[in-house]
């Protein structure tokens, strides 16, 4: 018996509602169900058409006035007890999420759970939420890696319909999957080396030995390295573009966009240098060239093509924009509050460097992020107390969203590793053969037809081959058994 359940005997004048839930039949007073009109059973009594009734139950018998529900009959006892007592108790034998789904189906809010079960229910729900988060993340990683692998296989199938499809397919696989074969690994290592060489050359070019009063000095060695790197980047992008199965999808890939952006500054600088000789506005052209040269730093993003960690970081930031937004919001509020407070107590001290609110913004930023350069600091006692509070609040504010972001990064990192493992096999996986199609109705009809034919072959005439009367079949079986017995006796 359900905890708190009691027997309710309807009055003689009360109309009963017949319920059949998974084979468990119960008659309930209408007044009992109407105590909670917003639940499923309460809404059922307000329906005025059969269509409306069938939207709330699985079936309805007009003759018996009985409502059928294909739900858990054991849990329905708890639901029925809720209508009698007004309190819902948790079914211990049922999973907490299944229980939640069941009461949601019946339209019962969790707020009706009695106090004796509420705390235990919430604890089990939170505990299962944590377990479900880990399991769901692993399942999502596996499922997503399988889906992306399936997308990659579909892209490979497109090459069969393209011109020079097999050649383009081989090139595409080696360019996209560094672990596919030895040649693919060599291409990936070469590309990574060129990216690192380009970054090193850019950093060396900024040293004082390569600077003069007019600007940078064109060193022939560094210039040769730059041209060689750009030639490699351009050739790599061109090969990927030519071998791609779909041009539109190619330009939607962020990694391909990064490859294109990384070579734009070089060619734009060449164009500006060419026009600089013909243009009179040399100063403005020089600034444009400097800006374009600074854009070469975007080449470091090309490492994302060869780094699982960078791709995971990008996916984490893309899917954690809510947490990142909260982090920025918390920091902005804290910086605004503490900058005004520190300014109000430090402005009258002539030895303090916190003389304006914008300067206090900088101080509050490096204090809340626990960087603490030391270039600006409070000198008064009240200012130091405010600074201590600012640092403590900064630690708490930054730590809260960072934990969530770190957990997501771990999951996406594992997902990217699963994708790389799935795509590193030398031979694409074979397609699973399609399962044979069987029509059970046709098979049954063929068996019945064969049975009727066998009856005719032994001298039994079936008057109506399409008849499905069970009595006629039994009579035929008796005749068939009698004929068989006579044959055996004769032998």
Curated annotation (Swiss-Prot):
Keywords: Cell membrane, Ion channel, Ion transport, Membrane, Potassium, Potassium channel, Potassium transport, Transmembrane, Transmembrane helix, Transport, Voltage-gated channel. The chain crosses the membrane at residues 183-204, 221-243, 255-275, 286-306, 322-343, 385-413. GO terms for cellular component: cytosol; Golgi apparatus; voltage-gated potassium channel complex. It comes from the Eukaryota. The keyword Transmembrane helix applies. GO terms for molecular function: voltage-gated potassium channel activity. Pfam families: BTB_2 (PF02214), Ion_trans (PF00520). The keyword Transmembrane helix applies. InterPro entries: BTB/POZ_dom, Ion_trans_dom, K_chnl_volt-dep_Kv, K_chnl_volt-dep_Kv5/Kv9, SKP1/BTB/POZ_sf, T1-type_BTB, VG_K_chnl, Volt_channel_dom_sf. It is found in: Cell membrane. GO terms for biological process: action potential; protein homooligomerization. It is a multi-pass membrane protein. A motif (Selectivity filter) lies at residues 370-375. Residues 205-220, 276-285, 344-357, 378-384 are extracellular. Residues 358-369, 370-377 dip into the membrane without crossing it. Residues 1-182, 244-254, 307-321, 414-491 are cytoplasmic. The transmembrane segment S4 functions as a voltage-sensor and is characterized by a series of positively charged amino acids at every third position. Channel opening and closing is effected by a conformation change that affects the position and orientation of the voltage-sensor paddle formed by S3 and S4 within the membrane. A transmembrane electric field that is positive inside would push the positively charged S4 segment outwards, thereby opening the pore, while a field that is negative inside would pull the S4 segment inwards and close the pore. Heterotetramer with KCNB1. Does not form homomultimers. Belongs to the potassium channel family. S (TC 1.A.1.2) subfamily. Kv9.3/KCNS3 sub-subfamily. Potassium channel regulatory subunit that modulates the delayed rectifier potassium channel activity of KCNB1 by namely slowing down the deactivation and inactivation time constants. While it does not form functional channel on its own, it can form functional heterotetrameric channels with KCNB1. This is Delayed-rectifier potassium channel regulatory subunit KCNS3.
């Amino acid at each position: 018996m359900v905890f708190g359940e009691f027997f309710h005997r309807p009055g003689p004048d009360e109309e009963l509602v017949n319920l059949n839930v998974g084979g468990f039949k119960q008659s309930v007073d209408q007044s009992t169900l109407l105590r909670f009109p917003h639940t499923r059973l309460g809404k059922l009594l307000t329906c005025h058409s059969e269509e409306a009734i069938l939207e709330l139950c699985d079936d309805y018998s007009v003759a018996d006035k009985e409502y059928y529900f294909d739900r858990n009959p054991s849990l329905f006892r708890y639901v029925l007890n809720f209508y009698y007592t007004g309190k819902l108790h948790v079914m211990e034998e049922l999973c907490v999420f299944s229980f939640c789904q069941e009461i949601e189906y019946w339209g019962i809010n969790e707020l009706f759970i009695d106090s004796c079960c509420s705390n235990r229910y919430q604890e089990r729900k939170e505990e299962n939420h944590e377990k479900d988060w880990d399991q769901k993340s692993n399942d999502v990683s596996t499922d997503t890696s399988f889906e992306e692998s399936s997308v990659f296989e579909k892209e490979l199938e497109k090459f069969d319909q393209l011109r020079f499809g097999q050649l383009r397919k081989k090139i595409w696989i080696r360019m996209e999957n560094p672990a596919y074969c030895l040649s693919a690994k060599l291409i990936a290592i070469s590309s990574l080396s060129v990216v690192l060489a380009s970054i090193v050359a850019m950093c060396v070019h900024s040293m004082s030995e390569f600077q003069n009063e007019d600007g940078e000095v064109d060193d022939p060695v560094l210039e040769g390295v730059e041209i060689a790197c750009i030639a490699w980047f351009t050739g790599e992008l061109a090969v990927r573009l030519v071998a791609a199965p779909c041009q539109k999808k190619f330009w939607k890939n962020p990694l391909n966009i990064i490859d294109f952006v990384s070579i734009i500054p070089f060619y734009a600088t060449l164009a500006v240098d060419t026009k600089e000789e013909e243009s009179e506005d040399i100063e403005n052209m020089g600034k444009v060239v400097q800006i374009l040269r600074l854009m070469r730093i975007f080449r470091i993003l090309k490492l994302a093509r060869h780094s699982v960690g960078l791709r995971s970081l990008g996916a984490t930031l893309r899917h954690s924009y809510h947490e990142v937004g909260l982090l920025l919001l918390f920091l902005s509020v804290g910086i605004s509050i503490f900058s005004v407070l520190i300014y109000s107590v430090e402005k009258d001290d002539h030895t303090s460097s916190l003389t304006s609110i914008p300067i206090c913004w900088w101080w509050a930023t490096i204090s809340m992020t626990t960087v603490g350069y030391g270039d600006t600091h409070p000198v008064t006692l009240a200012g130091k107390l405010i600074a201590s509070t600012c640092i403590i609040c900064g630690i708490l504010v930054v730590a809260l969203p960072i934990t969530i972001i770190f957990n997501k990064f771990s999951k996406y990192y594992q997902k990217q590793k699963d994708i790389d493992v799935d795509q590193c096999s030398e031979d694409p996986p074979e397609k699973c053969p399609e399962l044979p199609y069987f029509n059970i109705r046709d098979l049954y009809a063929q068996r019945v037809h064969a049975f009727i034919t066998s009856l005719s072959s032994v001298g039994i005439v079936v008057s109506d081959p399409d008849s499905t009367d069970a009595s006629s079949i039994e009579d035929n079986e008796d005749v068939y058994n009698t004929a068989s017995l006579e044959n055996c006796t004769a032998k």
